[in-house]
UniProtKB/Swiss-Prot annotation:
Keywords: Membrane, Nucleus, Transmembrane, Transmembrane helix. The lineage of its organism: Eukaryota, Metazoa, Chordata, Craniata, Vertebrata. Pfam families: CBF (PF03914). The chain crosses the membrane at residues 307-327, 358-378, 386-406. Residues 1-10 have a biased composition (Basic residues). This is Nucleolar complex protein 4 homolog B. The keyword 4Fe-4S does not apply. One of its GO terms (biological process) is ribosome biogenesis. It is found in: Nucleus membrane; Nucleus, Nucleolus. Residues 1-21 are annotated as: Disordered. Signal peptide: none annotated.
Length: 525
């Protein structure tokens, strides 16, 4: 019985929704047919506040059709719109009064649509976003302002500002809707003005929250900025949402220099604030490919990168990429850079997610033959000491890495050919010293590599045995070893085919067992 009632209620609601949609269609036709039916616009807008999702969607589509026609027919007042509560001037004609009234209805519609960007259903949010962007396109084609721009090219910046402000919420996560908005960022004019209004939004929220950006707001801003695909050449600019026949060569969005300027400005306004650790990592991961190449002055990022480099841990590792670009491509200096890089060599560096990236960059930074011998020796010695507790897949990369350092700097060969090398107790190297210049590494030797010649893994033993022979001048290629995992190493071992199966750690010799057996020493069988 209850199921039958529920089914009946559902059918009743569906019938009612169909009736409301038909009512919307009839009112739309009536408004477009005669100005005498203009008051029906109120009924159409009222449906935007319906509690039924399908009715809300129907109302959104109806308002889109309605104001698209009215904008094309120039049925909305053009110019500075007086406040709705104020009486229109006596000089206003009936035509102007009607257009003012309809312009106010359009503004009310836009206001309702902006509120619906926070609707519970994503399908409604998406439909609203597309409708508002359609209005932006129409306002650009049929401007509602009288002001003459220098190049006769208008863009409804104010409406876009309202849209972006609603995407960059302080408390609501809008990343899904921002991802949908990414499609419009492919338009050069939308991209340019989005970056401009985002800068203003960040500044406004900063002042409102006493120089602090709320975490959710930070996430929304990053999602928006990371969705921007910047053009590389000016010749590719020309894909505009708002199209005009006039020449737009002098228009700022059509200039790559101006695009870079606002891109740089919006990122700098965002990154000057304290970010969460997770957001720091996300920014640093895309910095070298998606941000620095598109900035007018990449050197402005030095403060952000040095601050990130000083944080420690994975964030410092990720900051290396950006610093490498600034140091090698833009000739920027970083005091105590190698001292900081040296301090990052901790046991945890072998287990972090970004290990391969770190050692790739460390290899680049240590590739110069002009580095002081004591510095290279300190890096080689510290890596060798850390190798004593490293897993085998890391050792297969670390040992060739150390050997390459010695090959580049022949003066460091003393580390593997020191005849007066003492034991572990007399090793002069100071592991706890953070300054490589004071670590006394050059007075030590790489006895750690000799220890690794007794490692349980055969490949590690073969790699460590290199120091027992004359070291070749040709460097080893470690690029293929940087990302080796324990699973890959295990799979490699599983594929090996052995001629004999080892049954004992020490193979039995003779009938009486091991060679060291007391019986075998006196009897031979």
């Amino acid at each position: 019985m209850a199921a039958r009632k529920a089914k009946h209620a559902f059918r009743s609601q569906a019938t009612q929704s169909d009736a409301e949609r038909q009512d919307l269609d009839s009112k739309l036709a009536a408004v477009l047919e005669s100005r005498g039916n203009a008051n029906a616009v109120f009924d159409i807008l009222e449906h935007l506040e319906s509690k039924k999702e399908d009715v809300v969607q129907a109302a959104i589509r109806t308002t889109s059709k309605l104001f698209e026609v009215l904008l094309e027919k120039r049925e909305l007042y053009i110019g500075d719109l007086p406040a709705e509560d104020d009486s229109p001037p006596d000089t206003c004609s009936a035509e102007d009064k009607y257009k003012m009234w309809m312009r106010n209805r359009y503004n009310s519609c836009v206001s309702c649509l902006l509120d619906l960007l926070q609707y519970s259903s994503f399908s409604v949010q998406e439909l609203v976003l597309c409708t508002l962007m359609k209005f932006i396109q129409l306002e650009g084609k049929f401007p509602l302002e009288n002001s003459e721009w220098r190049d006769s090219y208008r863009f409804p910046r104010e409406l876009l500002k309202f849209v972006v402000d609603n995407l960059l919420q302080e408390e609501a996560d809008c990343t899904l809707l921002i991802t949908r908005f990414q499609e419009y960022l492919e338009y050069d004019d939308v991209r340019y003005y989005t970056m401009t209004v985002t800068t203003e939004c960040v500044s406004r929220i900063q002042q409102k929250n006493k120089q602090v950006l709320p975490p959710v707001f930070q996430t929304n801003v990053f999602c928006l900025l990371s969705s921007i695909n910047m053009p590389v050449e000016e010749s590719t600019l020309g894909n505009f949402l708002v199209t005009k026949n006039e020449n737009h060569e002098e228009w700022k969005p059509s200039k790559l220099k101006e695009q870079k300027r606002v891109f740089e400005r919006v990122w700098m306004s965002f990154l000057k604030h304290q970010l969460s650790v997770s957001l720091y990592k996300k920014v640093l991961l895309i910095l070298h490919e998606s941000i620095l190449p598109h900035m007018s002055k990449p050197s402005l990022m030095i403060d952000f990168l040095t601050a990130a480099y000083d944080v420690g841990g994975a964030i410092s590792l990720l900051a290396l990429n950006g610093l490498f670009i600034l140091i090698h491509q833009h000739n920027l200096e970083y005091p105590d850079f190698y001292k900081k890089l040296y301090s990052l060599l901790e046991p945890s560096v072998f287990h972090v997610k970004y290990r391969a990236r770190f050692f790739h960059l460390a290899n680049l930074f240590l590739s110069s033959t002009h580095l002081p011998v004591y510095l290279v020796a300190a890096f080689a010695k510290r890596l060798a000491r850390l190798a004593l507790t490293a897993p085998p897949q890391v050792l297969l990369m670390i040992i060739p890495f150390i050997c390459n350092l010695i090959r580049r700097h022949p003066a460091c060969r003393v580390l593997i050919h020191r005849p007066s090398a003492g034991d572990l107790v007399t090793d002069p190297y100071i592991m706890e010293e953070q300054d490589p210049a004071k670590s006394q590494a050059l007075e030590s030797c790489l006895w750690e590599l000799e220890v690794l010649q007794q490692h349980y893994h055969g490949d590690v033993v073969r790699a460590a045995n290199v120091i027992s022979r004359a070291l070749s001048a040709q460097e080893s290629d470690v690029s293929g070893l940087l990302e080796m995992s324990s699973c890959e190493l295990f799979d490699k071992e599983m594929k090996k085919k052995f001629k004999s199966v080892p049954l004992e750690y020490e193979p039995v010799r003779g009938l009486l067992g091991l060679k060291s057996d007391i019986t075998a020493e006196h009897f031979t069988f």
